[in-house]
Amino acid sequence: MSLTESVKSEREFRKRQAFIGREQDILSVSESLMADKGVRKVSVNTIAARTGIGKGTIYKHFDSKRGLLIAIAERHYSTLFELLGRPTDPAQALSDWIEARLSGARQSILIRELTETLADDQRALSKIQESQIRMRKRLAQVLTGSSTTRGESMERAMWLESLVQGALVEMESPLKSRSFDVDQWIESIRRVASVLSSQPKQSEKDQRLTYL
């Protein structure tokens, strides 16, 4: 590679990194604004004003507000997927995943709200669902230590997710007890996750016998 080509390559790399960094900034600011004000009350103009990035530049990253919402949801599930990616320490991976879901309750609630906002857009929902399923499959693998993500493995993942969702609903409830303690909930769900991951996986034959 000549010096000129090397300089050009380096320039392109820096340009690409700046683009990625700016995109992440847009997503983070959008997420914060929407968590505070609600998805429908935050416009692209509002995001542009808060980030100091021109509206036209934002549209270079996302073709519409809907595209921005999809990207926020995809990033959310991708982050959870990465937290579960510790093959050498699955117990810690599960613990980090649970804490991220409950300590970051505002974010989890935001994802639900923006998903409801996109309820009439099947293509958007399909893209978000792909990210969710990818994360759920990883969760199933971590819980059972199995490469399969069907049957009992997926059931365990869904049980754990249901517990987390229940805790999030309780956090939002106007009937929430004054003594409600997020840390206690996190610890309780960690114990449940430990039980789920320590239970031996039934063979397919055993599972069939359960229903006889």
Features from the language model and the residues they span:
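Basic, helix-initiating cap at the start of DNA-binding domains
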Residues: M1-K37, K41-R50, G67
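A secondary-structure capping/hinge motif
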Residues: R66-L68, L114
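Amphipathic alpha-helical segments used for helix-helix packing
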Residues: S103-S126, V169-S173
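C-terminal peripheral helix-coil segments that are non-catalytic and often amphipathic
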Residues: M1-E10, S103, K137-G145, V169-L212
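Alpha-helical DNA-contacting segments of helix-turn-helix folds
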Residues: L69-H76, S131
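Short hydrophobic/aromatic patch on the recognition helix
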Residues: T51-F62
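Amphipathic alpha-helical packing segments from all-alpha helical-bundle domains
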Residues: F81, D96, Q122-T148, M154-M158, ...
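Hydrophobic alpha-helical connector segments
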Residues: A71, E82-Q107, A157-L160, I186
